[in-house]
Swiss-Prot record:
Keyword Nucleotide-binding attached: yes
Signal peptide: none
Binding site for ATP: G160, G161, T162, G163, A164, G165, K166, T167
A GO MF label: ATP binding
UniProt name for this protein: Putative conjugal transfer protein Rv3659c
Entry's localization field: Cytoplasm
Chief location bin: cytoplasm
Pfam families per UniProt: T2SSE
Amino acid sequence: MLGDTEVLANLRVLQTELTGAGILEPLLSADGTTDVLVTAPDSVWVDDGNGLRRSQIRFADESAVRRLAQRLALAAGRRLDDAQPWVDGQLTGIGVGGFAVRLHAVLPPVATQGTCLSLRVLRPATQDLAALAAAGAIDPAAAALVADIVTARLAFLVCGGTGAGKTTLLAAMLGAVSPDERIVCVEDAAELAPRHPHLVKLVARRANVEGIGEVTVRQLVRQALRMRPDRIVVGEVRGAEVVDLLAALNTGHEGGAGTVHANNPGEVPARMEALGALGGLDRAALHSQLAAAVQVLLHVARDRAGRRRLAEIAVLRQAEGRVQAVTVWHADRGMSDDAAALHDLLRSRASA
């Protein structure tokens, strides 16, 4: 006969095995967690905004990791088995806050050391510029400059690596947009939640297990153009939708924005080239449209302590048919000799 204590313990184990994110849920629910990574039963890593650290969580064995990965894939409406050994998906209603989580999993033998799980927490980005400045994510010398970029309706892209804080900065800047402007945001996954009274959000949808029902970001950018936007925003530019976004920004929709993966501002033109090619835009046309459509790049990165911060502001210049990023402010060096280029842009918009 089992006593009450043993019965309750067994029920807790069963609940952990069958609901939510299992033993990973406390990590996912913790304040500040952005990523939880499983590389082996005894190797669970967490990023809480200060870089990756190894957690104390341990799975019983490889089978336990595999079961969790397959259950999460099923909850996301995806398939994960030997015939389909990797999966991308999105989970909703995780944790007390009911937040969303982006799921990626790979099964062995493709993952040679065992099932790998990568979970990205998609908490709504709600902080404003003042909060980021107070937290040290934006240098006081740059905070006013960032606000001026928004007020002047300059089109901008936030660039940076994975988990650098691109969406957080973008949301904060959108929160500084005048309340009488209408913002239409297009996202692959719902992350942007700026504090703005007139915000419309469109979120893409993956095809179901039968391969139907997909709604792409590119399709939604085209829909956004029909919704009388003052500003069009693409949460993450990573495909052929760059063609439609640049076209929108070149047809009277000033102050548009988005994020793009790049290690530094200088890499953004080449990154946009590659994305434009996916949409059938050749190199010359891409550079021509990019020069006319986007004025400013804001680069975010982690400092040596792993903290996210605004690291660099650059303007785009076109020379001999090619767009180049020119740094006007750097977190370690302050304003550059080219800062006048940004001030000229701001003055021209103020007098328009």
